[in-house]
C-alpha cells in the first residue's frame, strides 16, 4: 500500500514550526507517523493539495494530512475495517464520542461535522482515488480517567473532573494545546489505559501469576 501525505505548512505558535516537526512522544510527528504506518505502507508521496495526488496505477492508497496524530491501535482498527469493507472510506467519528467532543474538537478545524458524523482528513482507497468516499465511524474507546479529586461542592453541576482517554487515539494538531493532549492524554495516559484494560482480563492475570511463580517473585516484581 502507498501512503500519500498532504503537507500542512501552517506554523504552530509559539513554536513557529509546522505540526509535523513538533515532538510527540519524544520524536517528531512525521517520524511517529512513519513508524506507525511502517507495517502497512511500502511507498510514499508528498503533495501540497489533494488534487495533486497521482492516480494512474489504481493501487491501494492511504491519504492523510501531516498534522495528524494517530496511534497503532487506531490505524490498525481503521485499516482492517476499511479493507474488509473493500470500498473507499474516510475516517469519521460519532457525534457522541466523548474523546472527540471533550479533547479533540476545540481549537481546530481539521475534524468537522458533516451530517450526523465528524469527519477527518484521512482517506483509504482500495483501488486508487475515487469520487465516492463513505465515512467509516471509528470508536475511540473512551476510558474515563480522573487525575485528582475535586471537592463535591466544586463539581456538583457538571460532575467529577475527569479526562476521557482514548484506547484508539486520533487528533488534528493545530494549536499548542494539542501538543499537550497528544503527549499526555492521547499518548502516555492512553498507553496506560490500554495496559489497565488488558490487566482486567482473566487470561492476562493468569499469565502474570504463572510468570511470578516461575520466577519466584512477587506479582508486581515479575518480568511480565
Predicted segments, located by residue:
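Left-handed beta-helix
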Residues: 5, 53-60, 68-70, 74-75, ...
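Extended charged low-complexity segments that act as oligomerization/scaffolding linkers
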Residues: 50-52, 66, 97-99
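Conserved core of the sugar-phosphate nucleotidyltransferase
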Residues: 58, 70-165
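Noncatalytic linker/hinge segments flanking ATPase motor cores
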Residues: 45, 101-111, 208-215
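N-terminal glycine-rich phosphate-binding loop and ensuing alpha1 helix
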Residues: 1-55, 75-76, 80
Amino acid at each position: 500500500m502507498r501512503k500519500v501525505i498532504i503537507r500542512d505548512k501552517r506554523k504552530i505558535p509559539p513554536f513557529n514550526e509546522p505540526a509535523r516537526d513538533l515532538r510527540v512522544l519524544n520524536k517528531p510527528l512525521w517520524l511517529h507517523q512513519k513508524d506507525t504506518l511502517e507495517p502497512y505502507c511500502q511507498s510514499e508521496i508528498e503533495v501540497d493539495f489533494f488534487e495533486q495526488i497521482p492516480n494512474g496505477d489504481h493501487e491501494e492508497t492511504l491519504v492523510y494530512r501531516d498534522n495528524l496524530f494517530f496511534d497503532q491501535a487506531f490505524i490498525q482498527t481503521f485499516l482492517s475495517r476499511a479493507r474488509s469493507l473493500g470500498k473507499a472510506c474516510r475516517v469519521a467519528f460519532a457525534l457522541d464520542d466523548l474523546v472527540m467532543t471533550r479533547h479533540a474538537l476545540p481549537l481546530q478545524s481539521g475534524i468537522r461535522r458533516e451530517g450526523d458524523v465528524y469527519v477527518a482528513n484521512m482517506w483509504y482507497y482500495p483501488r486508487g482515488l475515487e469520487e465516492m468516499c463513505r465515512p467509516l465511524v471509528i470508536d475511540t474507546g473512551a476510558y474515563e480517567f480522573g487525575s485528582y479529586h475535586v471537592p463535591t461542592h466544586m463539581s456538583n453541576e457538571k460532575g467529577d473532573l475527569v479526562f476521557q482517554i482514548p484506547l484508539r487515539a486520533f487528533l488534528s494538531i493545530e494549536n499548542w494545546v494539542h501538543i499537550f493532549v497528544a503527549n499526555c492524554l492521547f499518548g502516555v495516559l492512553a498507553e496506560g489505559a490500554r495496559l489497565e484494560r488488558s490487566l482486567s482480563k482473566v487470561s492476562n492475570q493468569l499469565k502474570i501469576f504463572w510468570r511470578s511463580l516461575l520466577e519466584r517473585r512477587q506479582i508486581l516484581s515479575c518480568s511480565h
